[in-house]
C-alpha cells in the first residue's frame, strides 16, 4: 500500500475540518478508516501521518495569522483573534479524534524522557508559537480595557475576555509543567492589579459624596459584581484565584473599615435589619472587622437587657412568671436580631449567648447573698435560679396558671425554662429550690400531672444536670408511687381492728427515703400529737416493721398535713386543710370552744418549740388571704406579728368566722391554711442559702482532692482552671471559696504548698 495514494483520500477531509467546512458523516468515518489502513499497512505510517499533518496545521495557522494581522486596531485585533481562536480551539478538540491511533503508537515508541506530543498538543503549540506569543500583550491590554468598561457600567461581549483567558490556560498546558503558571504571571496578575487600581481611584471620593450608608450599598453591589466577574473571567482552579476578591475587599471595605464600623452600634440600636445585613456582608469578608461587630452586639445585649430588667424590677422580683417571660422576650428579640441582621453567624450566636448569660447572671438588680454558717458573705449571685424554680412550681402545681394552660402549652413553657436554665451559672441553687418545690407538691398531692413531673426529671437529665441530683428527684417520684401500694395494704390491715375503719379511710401515709428527700432524723422536733392521732402512730410503725425489718422510721410531723372539720357556735361548718402543728393547736379548743387559752397553756399541750408555736399561731390569727381569722387574740396591735406574742397572750375561737366569696359571707366552705408547707426547720431563706454554701464548700474540697490525687503536683492556675471545669455544670466557684477551701485542706493535711513555690500544691497521700 502506497502512503501518498491513501493519504490523498484523507487529505481533503483534514483540510475541510481545519477550515471548518462541512464534512459528511460518511467522510468522517472514512477518515478513521484511511488513518487505520496507513498505520497498519504502511511502513512508518504513523510518522508520515504526523509529519504531513503537522505541515497542514502549520499552514493553516499561518493563514489564520495573516487574517488576524490584517486587522490594524487593537479592538479589531482582539475581535479577529477571538473569532479565529474559537474556530481553531473547537477543531483542536475534534481533529485529533481520528488520529488517536497515531498518538498511541507514538507513546509506545517514544523514550519516557522525551515523549512525542499528541496531535492536539501540536495544534495548540503551533498556534501559540506562530500567533499568540507575538500578540498576547496586545490582546491582554485590550481584554482588560473591556473589563474596565464593564466596571464602568457599559455592556461588553464577555466572550472576548473569556477567549483570552482560555488562550493563556490552554496554550501553556505542557506535560510535567504547571499549566497555569503563565496564566497566573500574566492574565491573573494584571487582572487583580487593575481591580485594585480601579477602586482605589474612585472609592475615597465616593464615600465623601454618598455618605457611609449609601457607600455601603455601592460597595455591597460592587463586591457582588466582582464575585460574578471572577467566576466569568478567572480560572477557578488556580490556587491564587481568591486573591482577586481579597484585593477587592481591601480596596472597597478594609480601607474604610473604621468608618463603616462606626455605624454598627447605631444600626443595631435602631434594629435596621436591612442595613445590618449589608454591613455584615461587607465586614464578614474582612480579616478582623467581625471582632468589632461582636463587641457591638455584646454591648447592646448587655445594656438593653439590663435596662429592661431594671425598668421592670419592681414587678418582676415578686412574679416568677413575668420574670421568666421577660427573659424569654429578650432572648427572642436578640436571637431575631442575630438571625435577620447577621444570618445566624455562629460567631454572633456565641456573642449573643455570652451577653445573655451575663444578663441572666447579673446580680445588680435581682440578687441573693450567699452566706456561710459564720454569717460571712461568700458571693452575691443572681436570683434567676430561684425565680426559675418558682416558675416551674407554678407550671407543675395545681395553680390558676397550670389550670388555664393546655398540656402542650405547659410542655412548651417547661422547655423555655430549660432554655433559660442553660445560661444560669448557679444551677445548684435551681436544683435545691426545685427539689423543695417538688417535695411540697408530692407531699401535699398538689402536682397537676404526674407525667409532667417525670418528664421534667428526664429533661433535667438530658440537659446535663448532675446525675446524683437528678437521681434524687427520680427517687422521690418512685417513693410516691410505692406509697400508693403500701397505703392500700395498710388500710386493709387496719380495717376492722379496734373499730379503726373510719381512720383507715382518712389516713394517707408517705414513707420517704431520707437520702433522696434531703432530710433526716436530725430535723426531728419535740411535739405532742393530738390524742386523735397518737394511737395511729404505733400501729403504722408495727405494720411497717413487719414488711421491712431493720428499717427505722423518723416521723417528720412538720411535713404532715390533714383536713379537719371546724364548726362555730353560729352554725358555720368548714373543712380546714392545715398542717399537723395547726391541727394540734386547734384540737386544744375541742373541749374549750368558748374559752380563752394562753400561749403558755398551748405550749404545754403541744410541746412545740417557741418559734414553731408562734409561727403556727400567727398563721391562725393573721392569715393574709382571709378576711376572717380562725382564732382571735388579745394583742392590741392592728397588725399582729409573732413578736407580739407573750406567755400571757390569750387565744380563742372566732365563732363569727366566715368564708367570703365574691363579696358574700358563707357559712360553708373549704379553707386551705397550709400555704407554703414548711419542709424544713430553718427559719428563713438565708438558712437555705447557708446549706447551699456548705454543700458548695464540700464539692470544692472534693474536687481539689480528686484533682491533686491524680496530678500529684499542680499550680494554683492549673488547679483553678480544672476545678471550674469540673464544677461548671452546677456552679462556678469564685476565688474566695477556692482559697478558703485550699487553706482548710492544707490545715487538715490533705495537701501542702511546695517549699520553693507557694503557688504550687502537692497532694499528701
Curated annotation (Swiss-Prot):
There is a cross-link at residue 709 (Glycyl lysine isopeptide (Lys-Gly) (interchain with G-Cter in NEDD8)). GO terms for molecular function: protein-macromolecule adaptor activity; ubiquitin protein ligase binding. Probable core component of cullin-based SCF-like E3 ubiquitin-protein ligase complexes which mediate the ubiquitination and subsequent proteasomal degradation of target proteins. In association with rbx-2 seems to be involved in meiotic cell cycle progression in the germline. Required for phosphorylation of the MAP kinase MPK-1 in the germline. The gene is cul-5. GO terms for cellular component: Cul5-RING ubiquitin ligase complex; SCF ubiquitin ligase complex. Pathway: Protein modification; protein ubiquitination. One of its GO terms (biological process) is SCF-dependent proteasomal ubiquitin-dependent protein catabolic process. Belongs to the cullin family. Disulfide bonds: none annotated. Coiled coil: none annotated. Neddylated; which enhances the ubiquitination activity of SCF-like complex. Residues 696-757 form the Cullin neddylation domain. This is Cullin-5. It comes from the Eukaryota. Keywords: Isopeptide bond, Ubl conjugation, Ubl conjugation pathway. SMART domains: CULLIN, Cullin_Nedd8. Interacts with rbx-1 and rbx-2.
Amino acid at each position: 500500500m502506497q502512503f501518498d495514494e491513501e493519504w490523498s483520500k484523507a487529505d481533503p477531509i483534514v483540510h475541510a475540518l481545519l477550515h471548518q467546512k462541512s464534512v459528511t458523516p460518511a467522510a468522517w468515518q472514512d477518515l478513521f478508516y484511511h488513518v487505520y489502513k496507513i498505520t497498519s499497512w504502511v511502513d512508518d505510517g504513523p510518522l508520515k501521518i504526523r509529519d504531513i499533518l503537522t505541515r497542514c496545521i502549520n499552514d493553516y495557522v499561518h493563514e489564520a495569522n495573516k487574517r488576524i494581522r490584517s486587522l490594524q486596531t487593537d479592538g479589531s485585533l482582539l475581535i479577529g483573534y477571538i473569532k479565529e481562536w474559537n474556530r481553531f480551539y473547537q477543531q483542536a478538540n475534534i481533529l485529533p479524534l481520528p488520529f488517536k491511533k497515531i498518538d498511541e503508537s507514538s507513546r509506545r515508541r517514544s523514550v519516557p524522557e522525551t515523549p512525542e506530543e499528541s496531535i492536539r498538543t501540536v495544534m495548540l503549540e503551533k498556534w501559540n508559537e506562530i500567533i499568540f506569543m507575538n500578540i498576547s500583550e496586545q490582546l491582554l491590554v485590550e481584554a482588560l480595557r473591556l473589563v474596565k468598561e464593564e466596571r464602568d457600567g457599559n455592556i461588553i461581549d464577555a466572550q472576548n475576555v473569556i477567549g483570552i483567558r482560555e488562550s493563556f490556560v490552554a496554550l501553556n498546558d505542557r506535560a510535567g509543567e504547571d499549566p497555569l503558571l503563565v496564566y497566573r504571571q500574566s492574565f491573573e496578575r494584571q487582572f487583580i492589579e487593575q481591580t485594585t487600581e480601579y477602586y482605589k481611584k474612585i472609592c475615597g471620593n465616593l464615600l465623601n459624596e454618598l455618605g457611609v450608608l449609601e457607600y455601603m450599598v455601592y460597595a455591597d453591589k460592587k463586591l457582588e459584581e466582582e464575585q460574578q466577574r471572577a467566576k466569568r473571567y478567572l480560572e477557578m482552579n488556580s490556587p491564587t484565584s481568591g486573591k482577586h476578591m481579597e484585593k477587592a475587599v481591601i480596596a472597597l471595605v478594609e480601607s474604610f473599615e473604621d468608618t463603616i464600623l462606626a455605624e454598627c452600634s447605631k444600626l443595631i440600636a435602631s434594629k435596621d435589619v436591612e442595613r445590618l445585613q449589608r454591613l455584615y456582608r461587607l465586614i464578614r469578608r474582612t480579616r478582623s472587622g467581625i471582632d468589632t461587630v461582636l463587641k457591638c452586639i455584646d454591648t447592646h445585649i448587655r445594656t438593653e437587657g439590663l435596662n429592661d430588667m431594671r425598668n421592670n424590677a419592681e414587678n418582676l422580683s415578686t412574679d416568677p412568671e413575668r420574670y421568666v417571660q421577660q427573659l424569654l422576650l429578650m432572648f427572642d428579640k436578640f436571637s431575631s436580631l442575630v438571625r435577620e441582621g447577621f444570618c445566624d453567624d455562629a460567631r454572633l450566636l456565641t456573642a449573643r449567648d455570652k451577653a445573655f448569660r451575663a444578663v441572666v447572671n447579673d446580680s445588680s438588680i435581682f440578687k441573693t447573698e450567699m452566706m456561710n454558717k459564720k454569717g460571712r458573705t461568700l458571693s452575691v449571685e443572681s436570683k434567676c435560679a430561684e425565680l426559675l424554680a418558682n416558675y416551674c412550681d407554678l407550671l407543675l402545681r395545681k395553680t390558676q396558671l397550670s389550670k388555664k394552660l393546655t398540656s402542650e402549652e405547659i410542655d412548651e413553657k417547661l422547655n423555655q425554662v430549660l432554655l433559660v436554665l442553660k445560661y444560669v451559672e448557679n444551677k445548684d441553687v435551681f436544683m435545691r429550690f426545685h427539689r423543695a418545690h417538688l417535695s411540697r407538691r408530692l407531699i401535699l398531692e398538689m402536682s397537676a400531672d404526674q407525667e409532667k413531673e417525670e418528664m421534667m426529671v428526664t429533661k433535667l437529665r438530658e440537659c446535663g444536670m448532675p446525675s446524683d441530683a437528678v437521681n434524687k428527684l427520680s427517687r422521690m417520684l418512685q417513693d410516691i408511687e410505692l406509697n400508693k401500694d403500701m397505703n392500700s395494704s395498710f388500710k386493709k390491715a387496719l380495717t376492722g381492728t379496734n373499730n379503726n375503719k373510719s381512720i383507715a379511710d382518712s389516713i394517707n401515709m408517705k414513707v420517704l427515703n431520707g437520702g433522696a428527700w434531703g432530710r433526716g432524723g436530725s430535723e426531728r422536733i419535740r411535739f405532742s400529737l393530738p390524742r386523735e392521732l397518737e394511737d395511729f402512730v404505733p400501729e403504722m410503725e408495727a405494720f411497717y416493721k413487719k414488711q421491712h425489718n431493720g428499717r427505722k422510721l423518723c416521723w417528720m410531723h412538720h411535713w404532715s398535713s390533714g383536713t379537719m372539720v371546724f364548726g362555730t357556735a353560729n352554725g358555720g361548718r368548714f373543712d380546714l386543710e392545715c398542717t399537723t402543728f395547726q391541727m394540734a393547736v386547734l384540737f386544744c379548743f375541742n373541749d374549750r370552744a368558748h374559752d380563752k387559752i394562753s400561749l403558755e397553756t398551748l405550749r404545754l399541750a403541744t410541746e412545740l418549740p417557741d418559734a414553731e408555736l408562734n409561727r403556727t399561731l400567727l398563721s391562725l390569727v393573721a392569715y393574709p388571704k382571709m378576711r376572717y381569722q380562725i382564732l382571735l387574740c388579745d394583742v392590741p396591735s392592728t397588725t399582729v406579728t409573732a413578736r407580739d406574742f407573750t406567755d400571757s397572750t390569750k387565744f380563742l375561737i372566732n365563732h363569727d368566722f366566715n368564708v367570703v366569696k365574691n363579696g358574700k359571707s358563707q357559712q360553708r366552705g373549704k379553707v386551705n391554711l397550709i400555704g407554703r408547707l414548711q419542709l424544713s426547720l430553718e427559719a428563713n431563706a438565708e438558712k437555705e442559702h447557708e446549706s447551699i454554701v456548705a454543700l458548695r464548700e464540700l464539692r470544692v474540697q472534693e474536687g481539689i482532692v480528686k484533682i491533686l490525687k491524680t496530678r500529684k503536683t499542680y499550680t494554683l492556675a492549673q488547679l483553678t482552671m480544672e476545678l471550674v471545669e469540673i464544677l461548671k455544670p452546677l456552679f462556678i466557684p469564685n476565688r474566695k471559696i477556692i482559697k478558703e477551701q485550699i487553706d482548710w485542706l492544707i490545715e487538715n493535711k490533705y495537701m501542702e504548698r511546695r517549699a520553693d513555690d507557694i503557688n504550687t500544691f502537692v497532694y499528701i497521700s
